Amino acid sequence: MRRPGSVAASCALLILVLSGSILLFHINNSGQTITPQALHYDYTVINTYPHDPNAFTEGLVYVDELLYESTGLQGSSSLRRVDLASGNVLAQVVLPWQYFGEGIAVVNNLIIQLTWQSHVGFVYDKEDFSLIGNFSNPSEGWGLTFDDERLIMSNGSDYLLFLDRATFEIVDEVRVHDGNVSVGKLNELEYVNGDVYANVFQQRKIAIINPETGDVKGWIDLTGLQGALGDDPEAVLNGIAYDKRDDRLFVTGKNWPLLYEIRLAS
């Protein structure tokens, strides 16, 4: 019979304080460490920039000092090149009315754009936005990013799907989970220093995901950011871009009037 509080208990809880955050590890009786609970990050707003309040943001990328944005809604979906400082649209292509634009990724001199339920993606020249081709997608398209080797896609489920950069075929997948709890409704994606940052549909937070294991390493709660004006339930947080050169992180939402540059607490 085990005594209450015995160190021989089958599962003990070890609490560590790390950089102001509490990190919980479950340790079994063999001393084996099981997956830690995700860290929760604070943030500071470093800067704000104008954002088109009519842009139903579905994809966002920052490359060569310019923003590239995909907007949704049938009849008004687009691919845009945007000046960060002013929010001005420098170039734009409007999708045919039947397509609902979704996530985008830049692969060298190409822009890859998903559509929601049409099972098709588009490939554009990054410089002049000319349409180079299209490809079939067996899944719904939600978010898209690029890890310098593979395209990584979300489809509203609790999986990240890995696509071959040349053929666009799905070659692998990983289930996303926070401990033993699956994390679904994954939306817009951004690859940041080995991790995938993911919006979660209809939530004001971003999951930081290890793309190899699917473990959620951390959460960024952005409840404090001002979103769209009014009470539109569709105007959710959606849009993450990373400036690799200057280590800047940008976030916005659907029909939000502002784009935020934020810095995570260390």
Report each predicted region and the residues it spans.
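A short helix->beta-strand "capping" segment at the edge of beta-propeller domains
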Residues: 34-53, 87-88
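Beta-strand-rich domains and repeat architectures in extracellular enzymes and scaffolds
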Residues: 46-78, 93-105
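Surface loop/turn motifs at the tips and blade-to-blade linkers of beta-strand repeat domains
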Residues: 48-53, 93-97, 133-138, 175-181, ...
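Signature of short aromatic-glycine-proline-rich micro-motifs recurring in repeat-based ectodomains
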Residues: 57, 186, 232-241
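Conserved beta-strand position repeated across blades of beta-propeller domains
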Residues: 61, 103-105, 145, 190, ...
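Short coil/turn segments that connect the beta-strands within blades of beta-propeller domains
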Residues: 64-65, 108-109, 148-149, 193-194, ...
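Conserved beta-strand positions in repeat-built beta-propeller and related beta-rich domains
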Residues: 68-74, 111-118, 153-157, 198-202, ...
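Short loop/turn segments that connect beta-strands within beta-propeller blades
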Residues: 83-87, 125-129, 165-168, 210-214, ...
